[in-house]
Structure formats: structure tokens, C-alpha cells
């Protein structure tokens, strides 16, 4: 057993080698403060897939005992991974997957388990560093890690100053959340979101982002060099591995180029994935038949290689893309708003052959998503939700729609990060759902655009519209081309997927995944400002659509906030919450109470119920002893048909509250008094103090009255 202790900004790391998980290809115990993680790497050397796909699985698992807790729920055992665990697994996967060589198709598993958590450490950063170290010292034959280690870093910002590797407390007060991973001078993965402050949405300018990125890059260079020097003695000898032979059969390639260039070019121009796949599949069988070649897989490899070569040559040499666009061109955009009559807000956003139907639903505090974090002692509430769905028919495939996958969770999280800071009404519960109806690249960014407009379509106030665009990259030798608004083909055959979302003032969220094994900051800078041009172009189109929005006023929930004396809040709640529950049931509203300030927020499906609840609450707290009297009322003693003479308690626009003989109040609705809506009840009953009433209906504490003629 050997220990290595390393000190970095806000990190005090200890790596233990030859101590745990020694049967694995690579295993280490990682500690930062009171947080302890186990990272292991395993591969099946005898099981190699014939497919080109790398069968790599990454699992980040939190053990509840790590923070002296029991698993919540009926079954007291860890089960289905939480959203945070899935997103952390994706973060590790997206960093480490590009490091595996072409042709490495052994089943490989990376597992990171949290065994102890002090409530302060950044578990995502800890998990990535632990996994990267376990992979580095393993016997997997990765040339990319021969002389370079991998590190992650999180950058926060407060009062204009950057914070490297902020604690969870510092991050909660930060204006920025930027996570970067890389090795030496190369960047592997970026995730970023702006955080709303008291001053507003706090979108980050491109210049400020590059400053933060430079800070991250300098940290990564220093950290990875230190890791390489310290970990190298513990690195195992790699097992034998024959890398994929990139050399193609020149004779077969010449045949394809000479005789089948035109049909391949035609297939490229079919921008729908299903059509292109069908045409290329038929062409492969045609070549096998006409050239009398038995190895169909070999033919497929050569046709796909030639197709990729054509796509990249068109971009690098002619600056023309497969669909005829220039490098900076955005696909045609069309937008329709509120096409769903009974959704609070809806938008159909179409960009080229990518289409997203985004709906928005507004709710109250009871609609918020309850969730737990490993470091939280009580349940937390999530009031802004974004759910992204990618049905198979969107790419022309026939398969069952099942449970939500990691990709859908990741795309939904990206869209949520992009939009959340722009929402001004943070107290409301808002759910956005993006249904991808057709996909040919950049569906997550279409969801961002549609989601921003869907918020406006249901009357939610936003700081600014948010647009998203996906950027691509094609490189060869010294040549480099950056693509705006990439299609599915360009994503597949390109070298980078770089998603940027934001408004006119700057960036609200970003995600970058690289396939090259690293990218320079110069290329990233160029892509960033090219994305800004596209974003502003898209925002102009979205502004035109926003100006034409017609709200679904009839179905939109209504809300109002008003103040009462803070010490009266307890009267609204009642013993065991009885009073507030009765008000909610009686008037069909949702109520949020702020004990310290005395703020009461009432939401209802219509104005009438809202005003009834507000009037009732104000009346409840206006006189001493009301609360006790209200709670003692025997509501079941009131029977339909009972008549009595009652004192008028209050006259409001929608009716008259009358004191009931055995406590409590009943309501005579205006419709039971007059059909003339122009008449004011206060004028009709100006000199009347008592009324002869009859009970028309009684439901719990809701008593409806009528006048006895």
C-alpha cells in the first residue's frame, strides 16, 4: 500500500495504490477532506466486440451510509440511480471515452463509489479525478495516457473574482458554474451554466468566459503534469493489444471511387438519417453483388470511409456542406406558438429537419419535485423542471418507447441549465417538456429555443429570450473548419460537438464534447464567436415569434401575493394545518406562506376562486379570536334547506359573506341575488345588516347560501 498526498487550490487529495480492488485492472482509493471514493477499472480481455463501438460503461454510485443516512423509501437499500448520479456518470464518460484508441472494443467498466462524504467536497470533481487516476494506472493499453494524465477543475465566480474548485457553500453563492476537464494543454470536455443573481440573469460574456477558461486551462496543465510525475511509478504494464488497422484496401477504394461516387454523393444529400441509411445499405449489397466480394463488412467499412472522406473534403476544400450550406449558415427556422389549446403554453420549433414541440405547465409549491442529495438532511424542492423526450420515430426507427435514458436526462439537464437563470418568477413551479418529433442534429438546442418561447407563451416573465446552437469542427493536418448549426451527418463525421446557449448579453449554458482527444483554446475561441453570430440571428427570428404570441388566458392559472402581519401566519395555518387545508379545499387554490415576511401567495385556476380565498384569509386575520372560532365550527350540523337570519359579515364583488348561526361563514353568490352584473351589491344592501337565508349546499366547510324570498 502506497499513499500520495497532493495539494491544489481548495483540494487536499490523497491517492492510495495497491490497497483496494486489486483484482481490477486498475483500482485506487481517493480521499479529499472527509470524502472517500473508490474508483476501479475492469475490462474483459477475452471478449472483443466486432462492432466499432466502444462498449464502455461508467457508473457513479453514492452510498447513503457515506453521510450517515438510510436510503429513503420503503426498501432500505440503494437502488435506481438518482439524476445526479446519472449526470455525474455521463460527465466522467464524456471525459474519458475519447482517450480509448480506435479498434479497442473490449467490454470495459469504470465504477466510482462514494464511501464517505463530508458535505463540503465537490463530488463530481472528486469522482472524475479518481476515475481518471484509476484508468491512468491500469494496464489498459491507452497510448493517450502514456505521458499525460487527466484532471478536472470547477471554476466559480464571486464579486468579479474567479474561485478555483469552490466548496459547495462557495458554489451556492457563485455567479458561475464552469466544469472543465483536460490533459496538459488540451481540453476534453466543458460544462457551464450561469447562475441568476439579485441583479438578473447574469449571462456570461464571451470575453469573461474565455478568462474563466484560461484560468481552468492553467490549473489543468499544472495538475496533470503533477499527476503524471506522481502516478507514473504505479502504472501497470499494458496488456497486448493490436490497434485497428486504418489502412484501406486501395484496390477496393478505387473501385468505389470510380464506379460508385455518384450514388454515395446522392446518399450524402439525403439529410434524413433513415433515408441515407437505407440508400447506403442497398449500395453495399450492390457492390458485394457486382464486384463478387464475399466480405460484406469490408465493403461497408470502405463505403463509410469514402463517405466520410467526401463529407470532410467538401467542407475543408470547397467550404460547402452536404446540404449545400456555407460554413456559417443556419438552417431555415419556422416557429408556431400555442398550437395546443389546453396546454398553458406550447411552441413548435422547426430548424431544418429537426423539430421540437415544447410545452410549458405552471404549478404551485405542491407541484415541485421533491428530491434528496447525499449531503442534505431534509428533502429539497426543484421548482424548474425540463424533461426531454426522444422517441424512435423522430429518426425513422420502429421501436418501443421505454423509460428515460441517460442521453435524454443529459439533454434535458442542458436545456434546463440554459433557461433557468432567465426566469424572473423563480417562486413558481414550471415544467417544460420537449417532444422531439424529428431529429437531424441539434435537437437539444432546438429544445432550448422552443423552451424559451414556451415560457413566454404561458405568460412567464423572462429576463431575455435564450437561443441555442450546436457548433461542429472538421480538421485535417493544418486545415480546420468550424461549422454552425451542425446536422446529424456532420455530428457523426465531425470532430466536435459544441453546444452554446444564451441571449443577447452573453452565454447562459454550454457543453462541449471532443472526439479528437483534445482541442486548443484558439479553435474554441473562434467557435465561440461564430456561435454568437448564429445565436443573435436565431434570437431575431424568435423575437418576431414572441411578438405574435396570443396567451391562453382562459386556462392560465392566476396568482396574487399580499401581505398580512407575520404573527398572523399561524392563524392561517391553524392547528395541525387544519385551517389552511380547509381553505385550499374550499376554494380550490394553492397557498404559499412566508412566515418571516408575512407574504401570502395564492394561486388558482380562475380569478373568482383566487379572490374568494384572498378575501377569506384577510377576513380570517382581521379580528381577534376568529381562528379559534373557525376551528370549533361543527360544519356537519348545517343541513341543506335550513333557514336562518344571519348577520352580514362582508360584501365583496362576487357575493356576500353571512355569519352562520353556529359559527363560521356562508356565501351568497352574486348570481343568487341579481342577474344584472352592472349592479353593485354594496349599493343594493347599503342599509341592510341582516339577511334571511337558506342553506343550498354544504361540503365540509363550504356552505352555499341563497336568499329567502
UniProtKB/Swiss-Prot annotation:
Residue ranges constituting the KH domain according to the UniProt record: 557-617
Catalytic activity: RNA(n+1) + phosphate = RNA(n) + a ribonucleoside 5'-diphosphate
Tagged with keyword Lipoprotein: no
GO biological process: mRNA catabolic process; RNA processing
GO molecular function: 3'-5'-RNA exonuclease activity; magnesium ion binding; polyribonucleotide nucleotidyltransferase activity; RNA binding
Residues where Mg(2+) binds: 491, 497
Chief place of localization: cytoplasm
Subcellular location(s) of the protein: Cytoplasm
Name this protein carries in UniProt: Polyribonucleotide nucleotidyltransferase
Organism, scientific name: Helicobacter hepaticus (strain ATCC 51449 / 3B1)
Organism placement in taxonomy: Bacteria, Pseudomonadati, Campylobacterota, Epsilonproteobacteria, Campylobacterales
Amino acid at each position: 500500500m502506497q499513499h500520495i498526498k497532493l495539494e491544489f487550490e481548495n483540494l487536499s487529495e490523497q491517492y492510495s495504490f495497491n490497497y483496494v480492488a486489486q483484482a481490477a485492472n486498475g483500482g485506487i482509493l481517493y480521499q479529499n477532506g472527509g470524502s472517500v471514493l473508490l474508483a476501479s477499472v475492469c475490462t474483459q480481455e477475452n471478449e472483443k466486440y466486432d462492432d466499432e463501438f466502444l462498449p464502455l460503461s461508467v457508473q457513479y454510485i453514492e452510498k447513503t451510509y457515506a453521510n450517515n443516512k438510510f436510503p429513503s423509501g420503503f426498501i432500505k437499500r440503494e437502488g435506481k440511480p438518482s439524476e445526479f448520479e446519472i449526470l455525474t456518470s455521463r460527465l466522467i464518460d464524456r471525459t474519458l471515452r475519447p482517450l480509448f484508441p480506435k479498434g479497442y472494443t473490449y467490454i470495459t467498466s469504470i465504477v466510482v463509489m462514494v464511501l464517505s462524504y463530508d458535505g463540503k467536497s465537490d463530488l463530481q470533481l472528486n469522482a472524475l479525478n479518481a476515475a481518471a487516476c484509476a484508468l491512468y494506472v491500469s494496464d489498459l493499453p491507452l497510448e493517450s495516457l502514456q505521458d499525460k494524465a487527466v484532471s478536472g477543475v470547477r471554476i466559480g465566480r464571486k464579486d468579479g473574482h474567479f474561485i478555483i474548485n469552490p466548496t459547495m457553500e462557495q458554489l451556492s453563492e457563485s455567479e458561475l458554474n464552469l466544469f472543465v476537464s483536460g490533459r496538459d494543454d488540451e481540453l476534453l470536455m466543458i460544462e457551464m451554466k450561469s447562475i441568476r443573481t439579485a441583479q438578473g440573469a447574469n449571462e456570461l460574456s464571451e470575453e469573461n468566459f474565455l478568462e474563466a477558461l484560461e484560468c481552468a486551462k492553467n490549473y489543468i496543465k499544472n495538475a496533470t503534469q503533477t499527476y503524471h510525475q506522481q502516478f507514473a511509478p504505479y502504472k501497470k504494464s499494458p496488456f497486448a493489444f493490436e490497434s485497428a488497422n486504418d489502412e484501406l484496401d486501395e484496390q477496393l477504394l478505387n473501385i468505389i471511387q470510380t464506379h460508385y461516387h455518384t450514388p454515395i454523393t446522392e446518399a450524402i444529400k439525403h439529410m434524413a438519417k433513415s433515408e441515407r441509411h437505407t440508400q447506403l445499405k442497398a449500395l453495399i449489397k450492390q457492390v458485394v453483388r457486382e464486384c463478387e466480394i464475399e466480405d460484406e463488412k469490408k465493403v461497408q467499412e470502405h463505403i463509410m470511409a469514402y463517405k466520410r472522406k467526401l463529407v470532410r473534403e467538401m467542407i475543408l476544400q470547397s467550404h460547402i456542406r452536404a446540404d449545400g450550406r456555407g460554413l456559417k449558415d443556419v438552417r431555415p427556422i419556422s416557429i408556431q406558438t400555442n398550437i395546443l389549446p389546453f396546454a398553458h403554453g406550447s411552441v413548435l420549433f422547426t430548424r431544418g429537419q429537426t423539430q421540437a414541440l415544447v410545452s410549458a405547465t405552471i404549478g404551485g409549491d405542491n407541484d415541485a419535485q421533491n428530491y434528496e442529495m447525499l449531503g442534505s438532511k431534509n428533502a429539497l424542492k426543484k421548482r424548474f423542471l425540463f424533461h426531454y423526450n426522444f422517441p424512435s420515430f423522430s429518426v425513422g426507427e420502429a421501436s418501443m418507447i421505454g423509460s428515460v435514458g441517460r442521453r435524454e436526462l443529459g439533454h434535458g439537464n442542458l436545456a434546463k441549465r440554459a433557461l433557468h437563470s432567465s426566469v424572473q418568477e423563480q417562486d413558481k413551479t414550471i415544467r417544460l417538456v420537449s417532444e422531439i418529433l424529428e431529429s437531424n442534429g441539434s435537437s437539444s438546442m432546438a429544445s432550448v429555443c422552443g423552451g424559451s418561447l414556451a415560457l413566454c407563451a404561458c405568460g412567464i416573465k423572462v429576463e431575455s429570450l435564450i437561443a441555442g446552437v450546436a457548433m461542429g469542427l472538421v480538421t485535417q493536418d493544418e486545415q480546420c473548419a468550424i461549422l454552425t448549426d451542425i446536422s446529424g451527418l456532420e455530428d457523426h463525421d465531425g470532430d466536435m460537438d459544441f453546444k452554446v446557449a444564451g441571449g443577447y448579453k452573453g452565454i447562459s449554458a454550454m457543453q462541449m464534447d471532443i472526439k479528437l482527444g483534445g482541442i486548443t483554446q484558439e479553435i474554441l475561441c473562434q467557435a465561440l464567436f461564430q456561435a454568437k453570430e448564429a445565436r443573435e440571428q436565431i434570437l431575431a427570428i424568435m423575437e418576431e415569434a414572441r411578438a405574435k404570441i396570443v396567451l391562453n388566458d382562459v386556462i392560465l392559472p392566476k396568482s396574487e401575493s399580499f401581505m398580512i402581519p407575520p404573527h398572523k401566519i399561524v392563524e392561517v395555518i391553524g392547528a395541525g394545518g387544519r385551517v389552511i387545508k380547509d381553505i385550499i379545499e374550499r376554494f380550490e387554490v394553492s397557498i404559499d406562506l412566508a412566515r418571516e415576511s408575512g407574504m401570502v401567495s395564492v394561486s388558482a385556476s380562475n380569478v373568482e376562486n383566487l379572490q374568494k380565498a384572498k378575501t377569506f384569509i384577510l377576513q380570517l386575520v382581521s379580528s381577534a379570536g376568529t381562528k379559534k372560532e373557525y376551528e370549533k365550527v361543527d360544519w356537519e350540523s348545517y343541513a341543506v334547506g335550513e333557514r336562518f337570519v344571519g348577520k352580514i359579515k362582508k360584501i365583496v364583488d362576487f357575493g356576500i359573506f353571512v355569519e352562520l348561526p353556529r359559527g363560521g361563514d356562508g356565501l351568497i353568490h352574486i348570481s343568487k341575488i341579481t342577474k344584472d352584473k352592472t349592479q353593485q351589491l354594496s349599493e343594493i344592501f347599503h342599509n341592510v345588516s341582516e339577511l334571511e337565508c337558506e342553506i343550498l349546499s354544504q361540503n365540509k366547510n363550504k356552505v352555499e347560501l341563497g336568499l329567502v324570498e
